[in-house]
Design a protein with these regions (language model features):
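Domain-level recognition of nuclease-like catalytic cores that cleave nucleotide substrates
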Residues: 4-7, 19, 104-142
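Interdomain/boundary linker segments immediately adjacent to catalytic/signaling cores
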Residues: 1-41, 138-142
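Short Gly/Pro-enriched loop/turn and capping motifs at secondary-structure junctions
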Residues: 80-82, 116-117
Length: 142
């Protein structure tokens, strides 16, 4: 695998107007990011919507939380809980970020508003920092 690089939104992606549901999802994502930024520790970096290029592919994790210590947390935000998120977080984002943050462990988390089966790990977004290295968790937050 080639070394991943950080970049801007690819020019070849369409600029179609988001659907009503997509707009709701974007607003919820911004709400989560704002909450994390306003309530978090100043020594913790929150990277929102960063594009990553590698192996002729491109991906964009919703949030990357980089605390001073402990694992870096890769976060996927959804309006409604999805069942296949862990695989995407580990196999797509995890592989690229493991190369960018060599020597740091990763953890993975899905934050969602609406529950559709399963049990939430927590109800508070900052509990993502309690995840152990390579652990996956889910947080329902409204």
């Amino acid at each position: 695998m080639s070394s991943p690089t950080l970049g801007h939104r690819p020019t070849y992606l369409s600029n179609n107007k988001p659907t009503r549901i997509q707009r709701k999802g974007i607003l919820y994502e911004k709400k989560v990011v704002k909450h994390l930024a306003e309530t978090g520790d100043l020594s913790t970096f929150i990277i929102h919507g960063q594009w990553i290029y590698w192996d002729k592919a491109v991906c964009q994790p919703d949030i990357i939380v980089v605390p001073q210590q402990g694992p870096i947390v890769v976060v996927e935000i959804k309006l409604t809980r999805k069942r296949n998120v862990e695989k995407k977080l580990r196999e797509v984002y995890g592989e690229a970020l493991q190369r960018i943050f060599a020597g740091r462990a990763l953890s993975f988390c899905q934050v969602y508003k609406n529950l559709d089966g399963g049990e939430p790990f927590s109800l508070e977004p900052w509990d993502i920092l309690a995840l152990k290295p390579f652990e996956y968790g889910e947080i329902q937050w409204r």
